[in-house]
């Protein structure tokens, strides 16, 4: 192990890690928004939109992120829509992640007993109040494990961003291996930085799950 090489290129990996984290978090934020909207449409069985959401989820979950990125990065400019690599990365992650988040949120919503909704309506609550105060708090706490797993999954999926020339962690490792043939050192740094990004999320997710399990409605 060449520690001099590792120390020399540590700042390069740090810069790549910030890029990976920035694009990853932006993509995840949009994925959460898309997922919540889609799960709500499915939960309330909105005509037409429900079918569109179902098609989107199947399309997103059954095609690789790399293919989706290539379509956005190379396909959209052919249709006159100009974009850049970072925007494509965010859009691709949001498109893929939205379907996974939708399924996670939907499972949480469907876990709530219908009697709770009926009881809320009988107390004079409208649909918004029922969702805001009765259904959503329980559904969110139930969805925590799947939500955290999806966040980690999506951050790991950022490793394909190098295919569209984004200088992320994977791009940096491949670049250094190609230039200096320092495979062990380059991959060691890659693993270390992915652990730095992902381990805190995993630990915080476990703590959050224990703290909010069923939001006090169950063990």
Model regions and ranges:
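Transmembrane alpha-helices and adjacent helix-loop boundaries
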Residues: 1-219
């Amino acid at each position: 192990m060449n520690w001099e090489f590792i120390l020399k290129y540590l700042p390069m990996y740090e810069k790549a890690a910030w890029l990976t984290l920035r694009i990853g978090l932006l993509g995840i934020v949009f994925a959460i928004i898309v997922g919540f909207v889609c799960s709500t449409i499915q939960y309330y069985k909105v005509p037409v939109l429900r079918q569109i959401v179902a098609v989107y989820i199947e399309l997103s979950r059954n095609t690789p992120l790399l293919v989706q990125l290539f379509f956005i990065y190379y396909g959209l400019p052919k249709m006159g829509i100009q974009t850049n690599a970072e925007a494509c990365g965010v859009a691709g992650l949001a498109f893929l992640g939205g379907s996974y988040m939708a399924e996670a949120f939907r499972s949480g919503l469907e876990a709530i007993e219908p009697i709770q909704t009926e009881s809320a309506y009988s107390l004079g609550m409208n649909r918004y109040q029922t969702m805001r105060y009765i259904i959503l708090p329980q559904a969110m706490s139930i969805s925590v494990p799947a939500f955290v797993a999806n966040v980690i999954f999506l951050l790991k999926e950022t490793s394909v961003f190098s295919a569209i020339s984004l200088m992320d962690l994977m791009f940096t490792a491949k670049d250094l291996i190609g230039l200096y043939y320092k495979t062990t050192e380059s991959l060691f740094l890659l693993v270390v930085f992915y652990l730095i990004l992902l381990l805190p999320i995993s630990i915080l997710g476990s703590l959050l799950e224990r703290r909010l399990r069923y939001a006090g409605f169950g063990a």
